[in-house]
Every structure is written in C-alpha cells, then in structure tokens.
Design a protein with these regions (language model features):
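Flexible coil/loop and intrinsically disordered segments
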Residues: 1-237
Length: 237
C-alpha cells in the first residue's frame, strides 16, 4: 500500500544517509504543493476523495461513522476510552461477520439500522443506503452515547450465536439457528437483531420459550417464501 511504500523508502534512506536525514522534512516541504479542495457537503467531499483515491482503499461507511463517534467522545473527554472500545468492537466483528460486500463493521451497523427503523415505525420496504440513514439530522444517532453501547451489546449477541453458546441458548434454539444459517438470504439476521434488541432483559438475555417460538415462525416464513416467492426483494415486501 502507499503507506508501506513511503515507510520502506524512508527507512532505506535513513540507513544509507543518516547525516542527511535531518534535511528530508525540509526537502519535502519545499517541493510539495498542498491543494485545498472545498466541497459543499461531506458527501461531495467523500466522492472527491474516492475519485482521487481510486487506486487505494476506499473509505467504508463504518470509517465515516467512526469519525463521528470520535468527535462526540472527544468532546466528552472520553477519546481514549472510545478508541479502545472501537478497536475491540472491530476485532469482534471481523471474527463473526463475513459479508459478501462491505466490511464486517458495516454489517453490524446494518443490523442495528433495522432495529432503529423498527423503533421509528418505518415500515417501508425501501431500505436507505447505510450512510444516508445514519447521517440524518447531522449524524444525531452517532452523537448518542447509548448507540455505541447498543452496538457492542448487539455484536456480543451475534458472537454467542456464532460460538453456539450453550449457556446463553438452549439446544432447540441453536438448532433453529443452524437451519436459518442455510437460508437463501440473510434477512433473518435483521429480524433476529430487531427481536433481540427489543426483547432482551437487563442482562441481555431472552426468554427461551418466546424466542424459540419466534425463530420457528421466521424459519417457516423465510423458507416458504424462498419457494413461493424467491428473491430477497420479495421477502422485504
């Protein structure tokens, strides 16, 4: 990547010409041109960045959300605490989420988005782009400290699903998860995320009987739709 290229060349220069190394920063500053680019909005700025950076790694939605969280927690004097929490959350998501597109963190934000949409009473089958959803009201959702807490709780729930945690789930619930894991699309993960966030108790646990009944219903619903109305768009409507 670009960073490694410059790092390796600077290291090589330092080892070969140690006495000249002190002049390198001045040399760079005297031969660099900084070109400021003004944009009307953050979306425009991001499009410009993506165009200029099309040979590098593009910014993910989660990168944008991280920046908003960072500003929020910095104002609260909790910058270091946030950095540690975010790093831990990223590592957790990389272990348990393997999306076809986007990043593991994007997947977590998508599952959480469905919960927030449900709380807001949004029943439209048209789902907004992830970034569009979270940027509403100047990223108000990401300026709520409780949002990060809920994201962590949701990620830990899916970690236990991934690990088939027998202390958290009964065998019959784990069997339902096994069947759903072979569903033709991932919509069931959004249903389950909404159910969990809405019905968990103070310890983050679910009533086994009610949860099992719910899983039975969505299993029948999803697999029936897969036969009669194949396609994820049909399932959304």
């Amino acid at each position: 990547c670009n960073f490694r290229f410059f790092q390796n060349n600077i290291d090589e220069f330092l080892s070969k010409y140690p006495t000249y190394f002190a002049y390198l920063p001045t040399r760079i500053m005297n031969n660099c041109i900084l070109l400021p680019i003004e944009a009307e909005s953050q979306d425009t700025a991001l499009r410009i960045f993506s165009t200029l950076n099309d040979r590098g790694k593009p910014l993910s939605d989660a990168d944008i959300f991280k920046a908003q969280f960072y500003k929020h927690f910095s104002k609260l004097g909790k910058k270091e605490e946030f950095i540690a929490q975010w790093k831990k959350l990223e590592e957790l998501c990389e272990r348990i989420f393997h999306p076809i597109s986007g990043t593991p963190m994007d997947e977590l934000f998508t599952r959480y988005m469905y919960f927030v949409r449900a709380k807001m009473g949004i029943v439209s089958s048209t789902t907004e782009a992830l970034r569009k959803f979270y940027e509403k009201n100047s990223y108000a959702l990401l300026k709520d400290t409780n949002t990060l807490t809920e994201l962590i709780v949701l990620a830990e729930f899916w970690e236990d699903v991934s690990n088939q945690d027998t202390e958290r789930f009964s065998n019959r619930v784990l069997k339902r998860f096994f069947v759903l894991n072979y569903a033709p699309n991932g919509m069931w993960t959004y249903f389950v995320s909404v159910y969990f966030m809405q019905n968990k108790d103070d310890e983050g646990l679910l009533d086994d009987e009610k949860f099992y009944t719910f899983l039975q219903k969505i299993t029948g619903f999803i697999w029936t739709y897969a036969i009669t109305n194949p396609g994820v768009n049909a399932l959304r409507t």
